[in-house]
């Protein structure tokens, strides 16, 4: 028998796909017999005592091979079982293993330049040519002499078996494009390529041009013929009991000797070979496995570090994750988001303690991933370890209180707790489920929800304290008292004390609402009598003028009494971030103020000049004698009672009363206290300038 020759690992990986991971020589892996049986697409009958769900092994040898007829790539891996299958094994140094080698897998080396293209109907036609993408022609192919007319060259490429192929590469057409002409039809016919297959070009480290093939599904397991699903390879994630129809079809093809395409790859994994490998692994003897990466089944020899890392996470329903999928032609990798819907053993009869396909998932895009119902924990990347907790409505009158430790389990969820040595417990149950009645949500959780609404969303540091990813030796959750360390007692005290006065605060905020004050003006001060209009201007009767005058005087007096209550709470928070010497200037009818730097103003005269320029307001010579302001205590003072430097430090808000009856609120006078000469009945119709410090 001719000895098998290992192929170029770089071209092998380019044909297998970028997401395929073959373990390195001397590395440690967990061998999953359950996954190996899925790869054979038939549950073998071992006729032996229960096999451990995972077996720790060392990689003795790796051979990269390809089928002589179809160029389908596969690998033969020799594994040696190691003592101790515990997941708490931290590193390989305990076993005296050497660091993983990077010779066979290309690990640790820079990936060579490669390009893959799915063949179109024109590319696969007999007698036609191959349209080369520009990127491939300029980066993978040898440099083309564009000065020649036409630019043409002969390209020599090696396939997966080392056989050379010659193609004529020409740059022509309108618009111009790169084409492979002579020699391409021969390659298509001998390789039996069809539209949908992919061609891979790779530039090796030695500079040689290599060509590989990725065949599209032609029926059998994992085939989605006639489907619009752009990710047909996802069907390979189906379990045996979820694809009985396809399995029967595959077995019929095997019996009929039909080994075309991918069916050939999967058909070569004999059930007897799987049973023999599992039996030898269970006895601690070296064994060999064959893996076809294009068979669309998960890898069953997984890096030990990846499995340990995944099983340190305390998985439970509601966790958010993302998972990478490669398209059937391996042209791109897409990430899909999902939620863990349940954590349950996939096959509790044959593999009761196996983490293989432990997670039952629900996808955000179920149409694309309708066949992927279960995944293994090491295939997903956790996005949020905080499960979704559905709470019943709570009463807003309840005061917040700190939840007690026994009140904070995850209600209505079940998740297993694996012990570090769960793989050794052949027949015993080594996982426990925590379950609670979802109908009786404790008040502590309701209070926590209320606190989140009052104080905002939890900070990242708080969420990090709610760590669900650590295991303890006795298979118990950490005490939920860890939630107490994340709860700020000062916030709790603040809410417990101030909730008694919540009604008063609510009233104060309502009184300071500008919209409600404006509505009050409209409802009280509006006159329902008929108005006369001359040239678009309303003409008020004497009674209307008196009513409005009386209303506005009463409104002004009320404003002075409750000014701080009405405005203080509404604008105080917006002014807290102002630096010393800065204040906000508001027109009466505007909610958005302008920031004014008082530190650059040296006197009150300059202040009014600045305000006049800012709001385009006329300035009067007697302005200073009529201006008053309020200090922080609400005491009315006149300008000059304190130096301008002290006034500048204390002032945070300036409010300019507008012309109530004028047409243009911008064209108003800045005056002092209303008098009979320049009040609301005067021709200027202006109000006072109030300065709130």
Curated annotation (Swiss-Prot):
Keywords: Auxin signaling pathway, DNA-binding, Nucleus, Transcription, Transcription regulation
Effect on the protein of changing residue 473 to S: In strain: cv. Nd-1
Tissue: Expressed in the whole plant.
A Pfam family that the UniProt record links to this protein: B3
Domain comment (free text): Interactions between auxin response factors (ARFs) and Aux/IAA proteins occur through their C-terminal dimerization domains III and IV.
Family as reported in the entry's similarity comment: Belongs to the ARF family.
Name of this protein: Auxin response factor 10
Organism this protein belongs to: Arabidopsis thaliana
Phylogenetic placement of the source organism: Eukaryota, Viridiplantae, Streptophyta, Embryophyta, Tracheophyta
Gene of this entry: ARF10
